[in-house]
Regions:
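Soluble N-terminal domains of membrane-associated systems
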Residues: 1-110, 117-119
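Short glycine/threonine-rich loop/turn motifs
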Residues: 368
Length: 421
């Protein structure tokens, strides 16, 4: 997504209020939470000498007002484009805010130039995106308990889904149509590979491949917005995630209906291992898949080890609790608490937003896949199985919301262990 920054000749007429507004726009269009946008803009305004600053942010809109350095009251209103998750830009703007706090006397033209650089920065090349799809699809398939042959088939499908996503993003500007076509490719490749004898369970192959399309960050951010009482923005994000899951279901169902050798998906999707070797493999693959998926969210590479470790740890805890209790709430609550608490520690230590860690490493626990399966089975007329997955989706959502809310009650001072040098 491209943001229209002022031309060089126009920057001279812009002041500190415009710079703060532009930063808010970058954050909004990068998928930042409402409170994150308001907090960052407030810190930047304070650093730039804007007094009595106030801001109101809603989905696709930013409004600010304050007293400039001349003591004059100014207000700004700006409509933003549809947000897309780009945690790298979010982290860069956060760094710029800290830089302004340390060096407040920077010219406005310099701030605009830095924001423009952030917007134009290329974090990953198309080949890296495709590689992430391959590793993510194969890893998550194995993390869910599939066999090595099914994981390999999911990785092969991930190649074509990744290529398709690159092509669709260039020529198709409707997001839900991109998702429908990408999920159709996943179903096509999974059934072809299964037909050729590459793979044992087509449902697991499709599921592993579709993990790279599941809108995990939208669900996590929506839950965080609800816990902050930002119901309008939370609902908008949740609907974005729901529409993506609906698009995935339509794409898979349409392709399966077309192919003469395809069959409807079964209710068996994953088999959590009970052996230590199996649990170890699933844990490692969950961490690898989390790190690979972070590429699609444009997370800087320096955080991959943190994210992979956290993703693996949360999935290990989930498997241990589930294998010993078979209690859904406990199996999600404690891993979610691990992710939220660790994310806050890492945010202070790494000096970056907790969203960078929370949105990515929470991915193995997110309820998006359950919602996709619920919609799919409801569409094919299997109401019992559809309602069962729908129940699991809402249960996971509210459990994660409880974990996030509990962690937010802890004062920030308890998470300060030291600063990274």
């Amino acid at each position: 997504m491209t943001i229209d920054f002022p031309r060089e000749t126009e920057i001279e007429t812009k002041n500190e209020m415009d710079a703060v507004l532009q930063a808010g726009r970058v954050l909004m269009e990068s998928g930042a939470e409402i409170y994150r946008i308001e907090d960052t803009m407030g810190h930047m305004a304070k650093s730039l000498g804007i007094r009595d600053f106030s801001t109101y942010v809603v989905n696709r809109g930013v409004m600010i007002s304050g007293l400039n350095r001349s003591g004059l009251k100014e207000s700004r209103v700006l409509a933003t484009s549809v947000p897309s998750i780009h945690l790298g830009k979010l982290e860069e703007v956060n760094r710029l805010s800290r830089e302004l706090a340390e060096q407040p006397n920077q010219p406005v033209s310099s701030i605009f130039q830095k924001l423009k650089t952030i917007e134009q920065k290329t974090f990953y090349r198309p080949l890296e995106d495709i590689t992430a799809c391959v590793i993510g699809a194969g890893s998550f398939s194995l993390a869910l308990g599939s066999s090595w042959i099914d994981g390999t088939a999911a990785a092969i499908s991930g190649v074509f889904v990744g290529i398709g996503m690159q092509l669709f993003s260039r020529f198709i500007h409707t997001s839900f149509l991109q998702i429908i076509l990408s999920s159709a490719i996943a179903a096509l490749l999974a059934n072809i590979l299964y037909y050729l004898g590459i793979g044992q369970h087509r449902s697991v192959i499709i599921l592993g491949t579709l993990m790279i399309l599941i809108p995990g960050a939208y669900f996590v951010n929506a839950i965080r917005e609800f816990t902050q009482n930002n119901y309008y923005s939370g609902l908008a994000l949740m609907l974005s995630g729901v529409s993506t899951c609906l698009s995935i279901s339509v794409g898979v169902l349409a392709m399966i209906s077309i192919l003469p050798f395809a069959e409807q998906l079964s209710g068996m999707f994953s088999t959590p291992s009970t052996s230590w070797l199996g649990v170890s493999i699933q844990t490692f693959m969950a961490g690898l898949g989390t790190a690979a998926f972070s590429v699609l969210y444009r997370v800087p590479k320096k955080y991959f080890l943190d994210l992979g470790t956290l993703g693996a740890g949360s999935w290990l805890l989930y498997l241990l609790i589930w294998n010993n209790t078979h209690h859904e709430v406990l199996a999600i609550l404690f891993p979610a608490l691990l992710v939220t608490i660790t994310s806050r520690f890492l945010a202070h230590y790494r000096r970056c937003p907790a969203t960078v860690f929370l949105a990515s490493s929470m991915f193995p626990l997110i309820p998006g896949m359950s919602f996709y399966r619920a919609v799919y089975f409801l569409l094919i007329g299997n109401a019992d199985l559809g309602l069962s997955f729908l129940r699991a989706c809402f249960l996971a959502s509210f459990t994660i919301a409880i974990a996030v809310s509990l962690t937010q009650q802890i004062p920030s001072r308890y998470f300060v262990l030291g600063k990274k040098k």
